Amino acid sequence: MSNGTGGRGQRPVFTDQEALLFHSQGRPGKLEVIATKPMATQRDLSLAYSPGVAVPVLAIAEDESKAFDYTTKGNFVAVITNGTAILGLGNLGALAAKPVMEGKAVLFKRFADIDSIDLEVNSEDPDEIINCVKLLGKSWGGINLEDIKAPECFIIEQRLRELLDIPVFHDDQHGTAIIAAAGLLNALDLTERDVKTTRLVCNGAGAAGIACLELLKAVGFAPENLILCDTKGVIYQGRTDGDRKSVV
């Protein structure tokens, strides 16, 4: 299998073997941890670890907000998945999702200089995932949920937003929705159409599709002009097959 056809505005061309080589050459994977402070002398080591580290420990114990001053917390995001909806590949398990999560982490670093770590949670139980992230949540400044299938992704995101005091962002919902809404608003502007009277069909009722329509309603699309379809057809109030909620 190869990817794309090349040329300007088209996806780069590469073979499966080239993709595997990219991920395996040198140090395997796409992430590493580097020190942000010098580690050249015994004094440096004493400040970074024992006994010097006790000073910020005590400061944070007295006031947890100091973690933003003395640790990586404020610029540290956790990219979290259970691998149940990996790209267009489906449910392939938590570990198989690791290359994607590493990829998202390097995008954070490359384009926003935000540090992050990937966490693959080996569970399909929403309550287990919620509890896992809740217990670890104080470590980071934000949560990026990714490649978790619907409808569990909605449950997980909503509960974590209620439980944690840091931003929780589900990439497949909100990232896709923001880009789609921006593109549509620009298209309407170029074609001189009114957002309130434009009719739109969304083909796909997963996390991304539902989030797209929710945001489009928020920016002015009339609910009666939005049609959402899944593999069984148009979604409507009273439909009994499938497990997708109606949002229109």
PLM feature spans:
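Acidic, His- and aromatic-enriched active-site or binding-groove loops in soluble protein domains
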Residues: Q173
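N-terminal ligand-binding/catalytic initiation module
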Residues: S2-P167
